[in-house]
């Protein structure tokens, strides 16, 4: 599935380009949020980082999948995570929100994980 590939590409990009290791842990999302914040502060145009943001969102989705047993859902070219209690989450859109200064992949993962535990 595409999001799994996008997530793997983000891991490689972060390791090779930024020398940051991502291990699919919830804690690693702090590094991803910080990287997105740095890119935004540099004034990079959205179009120049759209693919990277998609990869970061897919990576966050994979973290949620691995933490909660969720699965990827696709419809019309859009991808979401469906957690076991039936809730849908959009980590790719959350990465875009992070770039706009209004989101957090780390907090999205925390909320999704907490929702499953309730």
Language model feature labels by segment:
Residues 11-14, 65, 116:
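Generic helix-packing signal
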Residues 43-85:
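Amphipathic, interaction-prone secondary-structure segments
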Residues 6, 30, 72-73, 80, ...:
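A residue-identity detector for tryptophan
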Residues 9, 33, 75-76, 83, ...:
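Enriched - but not universal
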Residues 26-29, 51-55, 83, 114, ...:
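A sequence-level detector of short, solvent-exposed, charge-rich linear segments
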Residues 1-50:
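N-terminal low-complexity, intrinsically disordered segments
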Residues 36-39, 67-68, 99, 112:
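Generic structural signal for hydrophobic core residues of well-folded globular domains
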Residues 81-118:
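A recognition module on extended beta-rich or small alphabeta surfaces enriched in W/G with H and D/E
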